[in-house]
Amino acid sequence: PLAGLIRSKALHTVYQPIVSLCGGTIYSHEALIRGPQGTLFQAPDALLAAAQDENLNFEFEIVCISLALERWGALGESGRLFVNISAAVLVQVMAHYGREGLTKLIRSFGVLPRMLVMEITEYERVADMDQLATIAHDIRSAGVSLALDDFGDGRSSLRLWAQLRPEIVKIDKYFTKNISQHADKVKTIQSLQQIAAIFDTALVAEGIETEDDLRVLRDLGIAYGQGYFLGRPAQLPLAEIGSQA
């Protein structure tokens, strides 16, 4: 089924805002993939499972990234864009394109490399951290930024944070959900803030769904946030966030 969806160009991109918690302005957007509405493949989890089942992980990720960049360029957006890429596919992409090839590829979509943030997923499976660190250096040399996704979900590696030195780390929503009611989650976030200061990394709090959680994270000094309370994924990027946030 997924191979057919890819062939028939039935997949589309939606964009969710990432917000500056201090200023209440849009900092960036994350590109997310969706299947045809009203089908089993509308949800991204179903698409990811199908990619796994059909052994199409590489093709699926490349299509997702291409669609996101193509639409971003067509919209003439000047803001930053986060795209998800697994560590394994990132290694393959860089082996194929190299630093200069990557720059040309991004520009071919009408997007400047400095607008792009590669959000690395599934990095817990990395066998060769040194290789990934070298690739991270090449990506940065191309003008692209790096982010680690879902940090703290139990599989993430502090060593990888230290070696890759990503510009951004996204805190797993487990630590932000109902943070206003859990002192231990507050302490965990504060510990991550100390590590982020050492590595000069900006933090994004994922999964912000209530005003109370937003207030706590803002008071803690977390730079950026993402979640349904701030803005749901939509066909078009948001120009500004709603007054409730």
Range-by-range predicted roles:
Residues 107, 133-145, 190-197, 218:
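Surface-exposed amphipathic alpha-helices with a cationic face
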Residues 14-49:
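A short, well-structured catalytic beta-strand-centered motif of the EAL phosphodiesterase domain
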Residues 10-12, 28-30, 80-84, 115-119, ...:
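Structural preference for beta-strand elements that scaffold enzyme active sites
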Residues 58-131:
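Catalytic core of bacterial c-di-GMP phosphodiesterases, primarily the EAL and HD-GYP domains
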Residues 50-55, 88, 174-177:
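A short, internal acetyl-CoA/4′-phosphopantetheine-binding micro-motif in the GNAT/acyltransferase core
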Residues 3-5, 22-25, 35-39, 120-126, ...:
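EAL-family c-di-GMP phosphodiesterase catalytic domain
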Residues 7, 52, 73, 107-110, ...:
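Residue-level signal for alpha-helix termini/capping positions
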Residues 1-12, 50-57, 238-245:
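C-di-GMP signaling machinery
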